[in-house]
Every structure is written in C-alpha cells, then in structure tokens.
C-alpha cells in the first residue's frame, strides 16, 4: 500500500497484470468482443478510438452543449425548493453525456428510452454478478433484455446516419465508433458499437454524478470556500451571463481542485483489480515482496488516498493541498482519483470538463444547503461508492 508499492501495479503492462480476467463479469453488459472481451489487437483499436474522441479538439465542442443542458435542466427548479442532489446530478450528467457522446439525434429523439435501458443495465450489476455473472436473477434478466433493446435502438441510429450523414455534426463519439476498422480489415458491428457506448457511459456516469454531488456538498458546506469559488468564477466569466468557453473551464483551478479533493476523500471505487500473469517483484519501505503468478492484485484508492504519509490531515477536505507550493498529488502513484499509469482513465479530462461546467452554472446561480446537518456518510456497502442515504438539499436562486 502507498505510492512506492503501487508503482509496479500502475506501470505493469497487460502481459504482466491483466484486467481481462478480473473484469470478465462485465461481459454481459458490454457484450462480446468489446473492451476486455476483445482480442488484444482489437481492444487497442477500441481504446485508441475512445482516446481520440476525448481529445481537446472535441472537448472544445462539448462545453456549450453541457452548459445548455444544465440551464435547461435547472429551469425546472424554479426560484426555490428541495431536491435530492445526487438524483438531480445523476439525471443531469447522463443528459450531458448523451448529448456529447451519443449525439444530438439520440438526445433529441430516443434519450428517454436510452435512459431507461441504462437504468436496467446499471441495476443488473450486483455483488452476486462479480461471482456469478449469469445467475438466474430478475436483475440479470432485465439487464440482458435491456442490452438487446439498446443494440436494436442504436442499430436504427447507425442506419439513419449512414443514409443521412449530414444530420450529425460529427463531434459525438458514436460517429467515431461507427468508423472503426480493425487491423484485419473487418468493420465494427452495431453490437460492438453499442457495447463501447455502454462501456463509456458506465465508466463516466458514476464518477461524474457522484463527484459533482460531493463537490457541491463540500463547497456549499464551507461558506468561505464557496465565496472563493464564486470569486474565481466572477474573475473568469465576469458578472455577465455570457456563454462559458473551453478556455474558461481550463482556468477554473480552484473548482478543479475542489473536485479533485472530493474524489480523493470519496473515490467511487473501493478497489482496482488485476490478475498477475507472471511473478512480480514489489518494493515497499525497504522490503521486497514477490506477487506469485495467478494471484489477484488489489489497489485501494479509498485506503491509499487517506494515508497521512502522502496526504497530511487526510480526513480534512482541503482543496488547497493541490496548489503550489504544496502540490501533494505530484508524487507518482499517490493520487488515484482516476487510476494511474498506463491504464489511467482516458475520460478524466471529459469528466473534469463536464463537472466543472455543470457546477460553474449551479454554484453561481443557486445557494444550496443540506437539510440534514453535516455531511452524509459514505456508502461503502454499494458496488459504486457514493453518499449514503438521501442527499436532500434546499436551494434558493441567487
């Protein structure tokens, strides 16, 4: 445990530490020949295409879409009221993700169906799934049905786009996935395209909605920090309500560090898993250990990022720990909010962009106070770790 011991985990190649076997339980959700079920060559093509779709040139086109979706959603709040913040931000993050990743046609015409099917896919992932992915349960039955229907939906979208290519602006990732050709010359199938879209949504949805919820709660709970965040927003955007630009989001350093700190204290995944494909030597605190071939290797962001040796006063929410001169995250393999090394999350730039744009609008336009005193507990009993219980807040338009 700790940065030194974790170095071998995050520097290892797939030939040394494999993800495929330990995440095999996701195959019924993602589908065959998708991500970890694909051959190594095809998986590289899929991952490279994902990475291309999340580069700066495309991210620049997403800011206006995320802001527009956020403002449309918040119109329904009115001047004041109460809401479960986690539920609200979960709805908002999937709206913005669908607009950016799936495209305008999906968001406009079939979003409700996609959202309902995603719900059944998500709830088809239970603790039992890890050990028995195809157990004859109601959750798994709904999961399998939802995936079949999701493929049918996107098959129609793909056919429409092939017939009428001008209807898409080409900035969404679905457009990129449709163009995938593997090194053997074969073309990607609609089933695989759907699986990649599901995988991308799975990877980002929980992290974005949970981190935006925790960030909102932590910042709103500390009035002096909230004042600083709003001051930063005013310095970047001014008092006018001009549209947010990509360059504006890049300047939101304090808000960035607030999200980063929320993920340090409350990471969405307790464990990251690998299977040792060969014996591996690990050094820690002057000692050397051997991880035998065949063992399951685990790194826990939850434990590692609360180590006082790496992050002093680890139980204190302190976004300034990332700013100069402290920069406590700079030590390699210490900050694991988005994994690390060769398999660090390729969607982290999109996640920061999405959450910062949403919170820029939300925190400038609303005062938020949690109805119950203090901060919620962390729900460690869940597969994906978020706030425990409800997150009901009172809001008042500023």
Set out the residue ranges of the language-model regions.
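N-terminal membrane-proximal hinge/A-helix region immediately C-terminal to the signal-anchor transmembrane segment
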Residues: 1-32, 36, 40-41, 45, ...
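Classical protein tyrosine phosphatase
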Residues: 1-3, 7-9, 105-112, 206-231, ...
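Cytochrome P450 heme-thiolate monooxygenase catalytic core
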Residues: 18-27, 60-212, 246
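Cytochrome P450 heme-thiolate "Cys pocket" and heme-binding signature region
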Residues: 52, 247, 324-355, 379-382, ...
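Conserved cytochrome P450 K-helix E-x-x-R motif and the immediately C-terminal K′/meander segment
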Residues: 152, 156, 242-285, 298, ...
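Cytochrome P450 heme-binding "Cys pocket" and the immediately downstream C-terminal segment
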Residues: 223-225, 348-385
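Conserved cytochrome P450 K-helix/beta-meander segment immediately N-terminal to the heme-binding cysteine loop
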Residues: 299-327
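C-terminal helix/juxtamembrane-tail motif
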Residues: 384-398
